[in-house]
């Protein structure tokens, strides 16, 4: 791939069991680019993102993400690919039994961070990036939906990913909060991180 190209899909088929979800799909994503994947509910948007972090296989065509060939990637390589990605889920998937800081600390320790000072510094850094520096000791249930989504984005930023995959990140939020989350993702993209965001909300994208 060209040096500025982060992701290239060419004529790929994405299947779940024997069902073809997407057929003959192609697109290119460059470093620092923000791309919307827009479509109706059930049109395969989430499956496309899942194929990029190797939860769903790509059956045909060519697919390259960074230095990885997604059609031929080995199982042992998948964790290393995923560490270079930040994933933002619509339903947050925060650990409800621990604080924001402990949620973020859990991810860092799971991905190999050991130094307590470096862990604390990194958590402070990402919370500032998403405007949640005063919420670190809150439990998830004490946060609004928009605040929880900001924490999810902070979690996605922890390992300084080259690409953020945001799956309907505004799907459960009111219009004003959705606009704020969208602005935050654009700010992150302007700092050099590529973003692929799925949505069924044409109005949100148009605005």
State what each model feature region is:
Residues 98-106:
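Short coil-to-helix segment of the ABC ATPase nucleotide-binding domain corresponding to the Q-loop/switch region
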Residues 139-143, 147-149:
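Conserved ABC ATPase signature
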Residues 158-162:
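A short, proline-enriched helix->beta-strand linker immediately N-terminal to the Walker B motif
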Residues 175-177:
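Helix N-cap at the start of a conserved alpha-helix in ABC-type nucleotide-binding domains
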């Amino acid at each position: 791939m060209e040096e500025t190209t982060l992701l290239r899909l060419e004529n790929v088929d994405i299947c779940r069991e024997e069902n073809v979800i997407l057929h003959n799909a192609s697109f290119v994503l460059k470093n620092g680019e923000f791309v919307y994947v827009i479509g109706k509910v059930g049109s395969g948007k989430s499956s496309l993102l899942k194929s990029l972090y190797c939860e769903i296989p790509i059956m045909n065509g060519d697919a390259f993400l960074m230095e990885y060939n997604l059609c031929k990637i080995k199982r042992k390589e998948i964790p290393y690919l995923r560490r270079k990605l930040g994933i933002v889920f619509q339903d947050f998937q925060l650990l409800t039994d621990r604080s924001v800081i402990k949620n973020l600390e859990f991810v860092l320790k799971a991905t190999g961070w050991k130094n307590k000072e470096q862990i604390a510094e990194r958590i402070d850094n990402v919370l500032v990036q998403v405007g949640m520096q005063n919420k670190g000791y809150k439990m998830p249930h004490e946060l609004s939906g928009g605040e929880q989504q900001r924490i999810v984005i902070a979690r996605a930023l922890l390992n300084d990913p080259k690409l953020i995959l945001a799956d309907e990140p505004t799907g459960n939020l009111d219009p004003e909060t959705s606009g704020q989350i969208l602005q935050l993702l654009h700010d992150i993209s302007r700092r050099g991180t590529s973003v692929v965001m799925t949505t069924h909300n044409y109005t949100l994208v148009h605005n």
